[in-house]
């Protein structure tokens, strides 16, 4: 491996080498050698001239998020949809055939579709920009011997940066000063435990992964404790953060299932359209008709058969779904993504910050005399209670518990202000515990005389203190740390107010510790006494990163609906399985796989075992990518949730990337398709429900539009091919076309989401939107409409002379069939009475408006002239209503039969299961 990468100044005379160190190499070298390679002055920093000089070659300390495309290009890109291309071709053919009405209506439809899609994507991008501007990155940097407060984007390799508690690390740093420094690297590595940092060089054999480089502070990570200085070794895309970003940009986002379905439908419609042209031309030629005339008729029919309203309904339905998701605090960046969630059958979720809060919390206390206390409440606040045997403990009411809380509070460097932690998460959990008991003031009651800071080697921390009001008394020593280390300094333990010699109790406590550990708790032992080596063992506290509120319920519902959830984390196997079990993700039959085991397998091997795996632990971004690829290889539609830099590449590779809006990094949000503004995992369940509902609405529209379209096409084709008089004139056909693509059709796209839809299994993305069942329903409706309309035409045409009354009856019959067909198309499974006749107000208004329009066409004299109609009697209208309602009645009967069949199948299935159990 090269020590450094050099870039040349493209100037003839003053060629200078500008070095860039990798974090792995920098961690192996002494600080002095790193400074020499970077040509850096660690104490005084760089001068402004040198900073400008280096920036000319390294660029700004930021990421090149793909250059903004001009708005006109973004608008033009919306025309790439196959259905839009087909409609454009239809418009051109309509112009060539002098059918200007069709050409105008199709062009307007196209413009509406692309404009709605363009505006929605533009608004989502702007929302994302505003979200990413909430926290402007700044840092403290030494330049020309002075400490400056500057923007992180100004940093260059060789700059000296100062870090303190609460700071975000602005670039990759090689540390040369560190005092009790702990950094939370969970956003980068997935590790929930803050990493203790040192300055000594590391052997090459021990720094293979990012988490093991203890002398490097990585860009984007958070200082939890201590202070430090470091020299910048990598900025922007040359940082480890940047490596993830480059991987993310290189990953292509897959097409959504809806896009695939619409592509397939576009191809099918094209195929059928050309088929119609060919068949009609062939039949006409065989009948001896003029070939050019037959071509004109067949092209007109093919253009009429293409449902130009489909892209509008799809776009508007998706846009309304996106707007509903915004109300639920979710930003969807691209329209089709919300529907994609409807066929999502696997969710790969990062644990830290997504399933859990990333806020360590004390949940159990075990005193040295065997008393067990449960602690409620989550996070760094005072909300919660300490309960012993059903009673709430407060203050010094229970001395055994209070002593443990006192030791944890005094032997502590963390501070909680306004529910925000300044310090280590584990120490924050102890302060929050003290707040719940009203004892957090104890931290200020003691004066610290000496301190033994925590280190990863000794695994304990101790302080020597005196009480402010009793400074003449001997010092008291408080200790906390790993049980096996703390117990070495203890000689006694407390039992019911008495101090006893530590004997068999040690083994009992060890067993208790093991039991707590098996539950995935991080265990801390606490002790106090006059001197180290003469301490009294007080007891244990169990700490956990708790699950987010409502996650367990959401997980249960999703699993019941056929969605598999897999937890991916950088934590240990024990902790990962404990959290997964609490959430209902892990059972006795589940498997867990480590990152090392994933490395030993290729994608093909992993794809064979991945369906049975519930937990992936010690996983890196590379492993997450492999997991997602193996799931996609099995044909799964994968959603990936996450909030850290380590999730970004997988978020982009997944079919749906879901980022957390509050805790998520900018890189993570850039990679995601959807952002949960409130970080609420339950919103994913709402999105899946929304996605399934949207797809159902699109199917409802397709059923209505194609059945009406096929009926109209068949009616006109039969009349043309069999030399019958045309039952409808041109203006009447235009009016039917307006209804077919107009308000009644559009209103089907805004049908309220059926609450039962979440219980249905995810649909197979390979299935066409035109399923066998849907095609059957379309054909049945079309046949009823054609037969009914032809019957009315035949009934009125008994004198073999076409009169305005004949066409008016036929025309009105077809329109009424249309309305009843739309009514039955509102749901594919439920009766219109079950979903509610007026539950979709827009549909009611649309149908009412269409009927009023039809009555005006029949009875309003000026329109009678335009449409060549005449007034009908009340009896005529009642006859037509009775006849045309048949399409709705038959559809309702089919639904009833299907529901009955489904109930019988469920009953047989449950009976078989019960029999097998017996």
From Swiss-Prot:
UniProt keyword annotations, A-Z: ATP-binding, Calcium, Calcium transport, Golgi apparatus, Ion transport, Magnesium, Membrane, Metal-binding, Nucleotide-binding, Translocase, Transmembrane, Transmembrane helix, Transport
One cellular component term from this protein's GO annotations in UniProt: cis-Golgi network membrane
Pfam families recorded: Cation_ATPase, Cation_ATPase_C, Cation_ATPase_N, E1-E2_ATPase
Chain positions recorded as Mg(2+) binding sites: 643, 647
Stretches assigned to the Extracellular side: 97-98, 289-302, 725-732, 795-842, 895-918
Residues annotated as the enzyme's active site: 350
Membrane spanning stretches: 76-96, 99-119, 268-288, 303-323, 704-724, 733-753, 774-794, 843-863, 874-894
Taxonomic superkingdom: Eukaryota
GO molecular function annotations of the record: ATP binding; ATP hydrolysis activity; calcium ion binding; manganese ion binding; P-type calcium transporter activity; P-type manganese transporter activity
Reactions accelerated catalytically: Ca(2+)(in) + ATP + H2O = Ca(2+)(out) + ADP + phosphate + H(+); Mn(2+)(in) + ATP + H2O = Mn(2+)(out) + ADP + phosphate + H(+)
InterPro entries: ATPase_P-typ_cation-transptr_C (IPR006068), ATPase_P-typ_cation-transptr_N (IPR004014), ATPase_P-typ_cyto_dom_N (IPR023299), ATPase_P-typ_P_site (IPR018303), ATPase_P-typ_TM_dom_sf (IPR023298), ATPase_P-typ_transduc_dom_A_sf (IPR008250), HAD-like_sf (IPR036412), HAD_sf (IPR023214)
Location(s) in or outside the cell: Golgi apparatus, trans-Golgi network membrane; Golgi apparatus, Golgi stack membrane
SUPFAM superfamilies: Calcium ATPase, transduction domain A (SSF81653), Calcium ATPase, transmembrane domain M (SSF81665), HAD-like (SSF56784)
Function in brief: ATP-driven pump that supplies the Golgi apparatus with Ca(2+) and Mn(2+) ions, both essential cofactors for processing and trafficking of newly synthesized proteins in the secretory pathway. Within a catalytic cycle, acquires Ca(2+) or Mn(2+) ions on the cytoplasmic side of the membrane and delivers them to the lumenal side. The transfer of ions across the membrane is coupled to ATP hydrolysis and is associated with a transient phosphorylation that shifts the pump conformation from inward-facing to outward-facing state.
UniProt subunit comment: Monomer. Homodimer.
Cross-referenced NCBIfam families: ATPase-IIA2_Ca (TIGR01522), ATPase_P-type (TIGR01494)
Protein name: Calcium-transporting ATPase type 2C member 1
Gene transcribed to yield this protein: ATP2C1
């Amino acid at each position: 491996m090269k020590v450094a990468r050099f870039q040349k100044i493209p100037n003839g005379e003053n060629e200078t080498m500008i070095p860039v160190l990798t974090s792995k190499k920098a961690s192996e070298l002494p600080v002095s050698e790193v400074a020499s390679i970077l040509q850096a002055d660690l104490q005084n920093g760089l001068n402004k001239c040198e900073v400008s000089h280096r920036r000319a070659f390294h660029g700004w300390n930021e990421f090149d998020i793909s250059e903004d495309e001009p708005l006109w290009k973004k608008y033009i890109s919306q025309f790439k949809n196959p259905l839009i291309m087909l409609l454009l071709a239809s418009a051109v053919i309509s112009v060539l055939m002098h059918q200007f009405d069709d050409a105008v209506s199709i062009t307007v439809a196209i413009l509406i579709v692309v404009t709605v899609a363009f505006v929605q994507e533009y608004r989502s991008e702007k929302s994302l920009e505003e979200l990413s501007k909430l926290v402007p990155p700044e840092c403290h940097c030494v330049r020309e011997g002075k400490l400056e407060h500057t923007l992180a984007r100004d940093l260059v390799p060789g700059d000296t940066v100062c870090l303190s508690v609460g700071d975000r690390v602005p670039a990759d740093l090689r540390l040369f000063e560190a005092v009790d420094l702990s950094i939370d690297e969970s956003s980068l590595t997935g590790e929930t435990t803050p990493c203790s940092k040192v300055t000594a060089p590391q052997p090459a054999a021990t720094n293979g992964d990012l988490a093991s480089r203890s002398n490097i502070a990585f860009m984007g990570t958070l200082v939890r404790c201590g202070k430090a200085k470091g020299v910048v070794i990598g900025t922007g895309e040359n940082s480890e953060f940047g490596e993830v970003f480059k991987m993310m940009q290189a990953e292509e986002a897959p097409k959504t299932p809806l896009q695939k379905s619409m592509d397939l439908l576009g191809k099918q419609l094209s195929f059928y359209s050309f088929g119609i042209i060919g068949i009609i031309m062939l039949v006409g030629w065989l009948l001896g008709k003029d070939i050019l005339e037959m071509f004109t008729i067949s092209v007109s029919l093919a253009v009429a058969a293409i449902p130009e309203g489909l892209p509008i309904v799809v776009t508007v339905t998706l846009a309304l779904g996106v707007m509903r998701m915004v109300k639920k605090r979710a930003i969807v960046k691209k329209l089709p993504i919300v529907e994609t969630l409807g066929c999502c059958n696997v969710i790969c979720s990062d644990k830290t910050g997504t399933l859990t809060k990333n806020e360590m919390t004390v949940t159990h206390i075990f005193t040295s005399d065997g008393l067990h206390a449960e602690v409620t409440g989550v996070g760094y606040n005072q909300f919660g209670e300490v309960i012993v045997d059903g009673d709430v403990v407060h203050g010094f009411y229970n001395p055994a518990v209070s002593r443990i809380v006192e030791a944890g509070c005094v032997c502590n460097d963390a501070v909680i202000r306004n529910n925000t932690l300044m310090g280590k998460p584990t120490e924050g959990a102890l302060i929050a515990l003290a707040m719940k008991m009203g004892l957090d003031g104890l931290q200020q009651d003691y004066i610290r005389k000496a301190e033994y800071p925590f280190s990863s080697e000794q695994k304990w921390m101790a302080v020597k203190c005196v009480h402010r009001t009793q400074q003449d008394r001997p010092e008291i020593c408080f200790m906390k740390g790993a049980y096996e280390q703390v117990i070495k300094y203890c000689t006694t333990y407390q039992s019911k107010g008495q101090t006893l010699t530590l004997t068999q109790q040690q083994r009992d406590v060890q067993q208790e510790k093991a039991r707590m550990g098996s539950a995935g708790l991080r265990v801390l032992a606490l002790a106090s006494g006059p001197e180290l080596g003469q301490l009294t063992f007080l007891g244990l506290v169990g700490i956990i990163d708790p699950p987010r509120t409502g996650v367990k319920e959401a997980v249960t519902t999703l699993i019941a609906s056929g969605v598999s959830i897999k937890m991916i984390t950088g934590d240990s196997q024990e902790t990962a399985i404990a959290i997964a079990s609490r959430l209902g993700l892990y059972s006795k039959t589940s498997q867990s796989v480590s990152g090392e085991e994933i490395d030993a397998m290729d994608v093909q091997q992993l794809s064979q075992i991945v369906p049975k795996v519930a937990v992936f632990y010690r996983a890196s971004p590379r492993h997450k990518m492999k997991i997602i690829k193996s799931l996609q290889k099995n044909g799964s539609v994968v959603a990936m949730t996450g909030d850290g830099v380590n999730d970004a590449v997988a978020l982009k590779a997944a079919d749906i990337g879901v980022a957390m809006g509050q805790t998520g990094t900018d890189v993570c949000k850039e990679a995601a398709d959807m952002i949960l503004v409130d970080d609420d995992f339950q919103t994913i369940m709402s999105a899946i429900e929304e996605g399934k509902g949207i797809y159902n609405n699109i199917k409802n529209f397709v059923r209505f539009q194609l059945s009406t379209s096929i009926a109209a096409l068949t009616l006109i084709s039969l009349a043309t091919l069999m030399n019958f008089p045309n039952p409808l004139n041109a203006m009447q056909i235009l009016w039917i076309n307006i209804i077919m693509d107009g308000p009644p059709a559009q209103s089907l796209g805004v049908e309220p989401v059926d609450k039962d839809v979440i219980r249905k299994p995810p649909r197979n993305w390979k299935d066409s939107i035109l399923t066998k069942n849907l095609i059957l329903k379309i054909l049945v409706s079309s046949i009823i409409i054609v037969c009914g309309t032809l019957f009315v035409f035949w009934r009125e045409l008994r004198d073999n002379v076409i009169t305005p009354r004949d066409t008016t009856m036929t025309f009105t019959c077809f329109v009424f069939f249309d309305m009843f067909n739309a009514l039955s198309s509102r749901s594919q499974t439920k009766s219109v009475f079950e979903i509610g006749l007026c539950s979709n107000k827009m549909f009611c208004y649309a149908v009412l408006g269409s009927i009023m329009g039809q009555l005006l066409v029949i009875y309003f004299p000026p329109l009678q002239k335009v449409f060549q109609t005449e007034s009908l009697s009340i009896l005529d209208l009642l006859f037509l209503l009775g006849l045309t309602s048949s399409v709705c009645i038959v559809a309702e009967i089919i639904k009833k039969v299907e529901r009955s069949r489904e109930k019988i199948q469920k009953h047989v299935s449950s009976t078989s299961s019960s029999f097998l159990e017996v």
